[in-house]
Amino acid sequence: MGDTVVEPAPLKPTSEPTSGPPGNNGGSLLSVITEGVGELSVIDPEVAQKACQEVLEKVKLLHGGVAVSSRGTPLELVNGDGVDSEIRCLDDPPAQIREEEDEMGAAVASGTAKGARRRRQNNSAKQSWLLRLFESKLFDISMAISYLYNSKEPGVQAYIGNRLFCFRNEDVDFYLPQLLNMYIHMDEDVGDAIKPYIVHRCRQSINFSLQCALLLGAYSSDMHISTQRHSRGTKLRKLILSDELKPAHRKRELPSLSPAPDTGLSPSKRTHQRSKSDATASISLSSNLKRTASNPKVENEDEELSSSTESIDNSFSSPVRLAPEREFIKSLMAIGKRLATLPTKEQKTQRLISELSLLNHKLPARVWLPTAGFDHHVVRVPHTQAVVLNSKDKAPYLIYVEVLECENFDTTSVPARIPENRIRSTRSVENLPECGITHEQRAGSFSTVPNYDNDDEAWSVDDIGELQVELPEVHTNSCDNISQFSVDSITSQESKEPVFIAAGDIRRRLSEQLAHTPTAFKRDPEDPSAVALKEPWQEKVRRIREGSPYGHLPNWRLLSVIVKCGDDLRQELLAFQVLKQLQSIWEQERVPLWIKPYKILVISADSGMIEPVVNAVSIHQVKKQSQLSLLDYFLQEHGSYTTEAFLSAQRNFVQSCAGYCLVCYLLQVKDRHNGNILLDAEGHIIHIDFGFILSSSPRNLGFETSAFKLTTEFVDVMGGLDGDMFNYYKMLMLQGLIAARKHMDKVVQIVEIMQQGSQLPCFHGSSTIRNLKERFHMSMTEEQLQLLVEQMVDGSMRSITTKLYDGFQYLTNGIM
């Protein structure tokens, strides 16, 4: 989960090479890549250089050529046959090299000494040119992935595999699906180049290990079952899921065994009977560690404190470190499958709340939410806030998750459990000792009770099923309603001088706030998610924090996630990568287009998690709840045409609409009904659900033939066909397309690599990649592109198929 940069470590070959020609070495220098799980070996650039020379020597001997020696350069990469380069470069070679190739063509064919000499000179020039590219600042992770995929030279692949260690972790993580897909479906040389980096990162990060294990399983599922069982991807996945890649010599923080002030957390005072996974690590603050069935290491109730400490230390390393998290995810998926069997939304919602209440009995634990970007432990799921989302056949659901941020997930102790009826103290943080928690104790609360996941069955679904449904009651007492710091109290404490504010300013601001306060949605039994999604995120965080027993802690955070069962999110992940790349391109080219890529976690070929877009509801929900047109809703939410709030929201709408129109055109996104288009509180639109892209469409009906969805309601919000904002929209479309085609290779390679060995419907047909490239219109002038944009906008506005598809969705699913 960290963002540190791993520098490549020097590696000594297993045997010292001789001083003779590379071809005379006893063994392949590429064997320095270790296949085992012992100490990780990294390919040194010097070794990669010699490996390249070895490959060259073998090919030269087959063609009757002469080996090229290293002329003092740190690394010389060469082509395979001396004539046609097998290394695909991003740009054409310099003109001088091209001229030399033309001049020496006949000489090389005749095999004369002069031709051979020129060939060696040409190879040296090519090597020097490629080396300069690899060592330049322009050589980024995108180029590295491109060379790794396209090159047929084992030496080049080995060098790129070593260079992965030089890039930032987050840059490589973006291409993790591509790296693992190449590892699964491409030849052994590519896999050998990638594996050292993957193994090294798995040792460093438990979250990276989980991501790799999940993706390896999902992308191996397209293989035949007999092949899949013995594939490299399956073997690497088993290695990651075992405990062999656990970081060496790393110990977790031990729970404090010294006497501490009464925190209300000792086992004798708990009102809830923990499962046996909790008993594994339960510690009485007034006695020694007690023997339990799931802790065989403890042999005597009267052991000394030192032996108790040793036993706990040993128990930390006993379970497989990914097991609790995998069981946590499995529990969430099992809930979704059970919900899908219920007929009505109301029944699904009630069952969801009950299931999550049971799940809370297992928390806190050494589990985390993989969609988050920081280290944390999950401590509680506010079950009454969960909602079932709209779906005709399945039951995706949205949950909110309370976590405590920590410096290091592996080494920080799991937070102590605080019973539901011990909600935070009132008025201010200074009053917390009234609830039994001092300031010092609060800072060290992570070490009060050890982690509860030391049992292999810490997150077994069967164990959850044995628990009784126990909906906690929230008592209103002096500890219930923490801290409503009034403005008066803050002012009196912090401000030494009076602050004078003009009464007119106060009246004006209050009137604007009243006029532009976002409206709340009414509760709809058929769509319970509308109310939850409409509530402002900050208000939701404040409300949940006030009702949480962990809310007083300074490192408390609230996260949210959508759990989906029965849906293949691999296409969603591909779309996320393309959107993220386009977003980066437009930022780099300073084109003010706005899109919102949301994180995707692929769990298997038919399940996953999605990061929700906060402060956003679907256009379908907007129209159903408000019974207004889109323009009238904007006026209701943001004020009249001339207010700053409306103009800002209108600009946001235009910039996001232009961005997503280009995304929909380039990726051929289908199923664009109003349930799959969100509108946020600032006026942006956000497209969701990229299940139909490129070569696939819903039920292959072929309804949506326009380049993108642009309705008359969208144009009305922009100010009409003659408005300045509509012209601004078309200008942004043109600028965005020009910027995107400058970086076409970065976008195309994301899709092209994932097509390797894939059975996803978006890759059906042999022309998927060719058609994608054609949509960038590389041969068109800017004037021709402008005409193309005008035609696409006009065609999309007048598209009868868009209206037909919206009508079809209304009749079949009730989507407005």
UniProtKB/Swiss-Prot annotation:
Main subcellular location: membrane
Phosphoserine occurs at which residues? 258, 266, 275, 277, 284, 294, 428, 511
Q: Which organism is it from?
A: Homo sapiens
| A GO MF label | 1-phosphatidylinositol 4-kinase activity
PROSITE patterns xref list:
PI3_4_KINASE_1, PI3_4_KINASE_2, PI3_4_KINASE_3, PIK_HELICAL
What EC number(s) has UniProt assigned to this enzyme? 2.7.1.67
Membrane topology classification: Peripheral membrane protein
What does the UniProt entry list as the effect of changing residue 44 to A?
Answer: Loss of interaction with ACBD3
**Stretch list, region Catalytic loop:** 668-676
Segments carrying the region annotation (Interaction with ACBD3) are 41-67
| Phenotypic consequence of residue 52 to A | No effect on ACBD3-, ARMH3-, nor RAB11B-binding
The PIK helical domain is annotated at 29-242
Region described as Disordered: 1-30, 101-120, 248-318
- What does the UniProt record note about how this protein's activity is regulated? Inhibited by wortmannin and adenosine. Increased kinase activity upon interaction with NCS1/FREQ. (Microbial infection) Activated by Aichi virus protein 3A, this activation is sensitized by ACBD3.
Indicate the family of this protein.
Answer: Belongs to the PI3/PI4-kinase family. Type III PI4K subfamily.
Q: Which residues cross the membrane?
A: none
What protein is this chain from? Phosphatidylinositol 4-kinase beta
Location within or outside the cell = Endomembrane system; Mitochondrion outer membrane; Rough endoplasmic reticulum membrane; Golgi apparatus
What is the stated purpose of this protein?
Phosphorylates phosphatidylinositol (PI) in the first committed step in the production of the second messenger inositol-1,4,5,-trisphosphate (PIP). May regulate Golgi disintegration/reorganization during mitosis, possibly via its phosphorylation. Involved in Golgi-to-plasma membrane trafficking. May play an important role in the inner ear development.
Top-level EC class as recorded in UniProt: transferase
Q: Which cofactor does it need?
A: Mg(2+); Mn(2+)
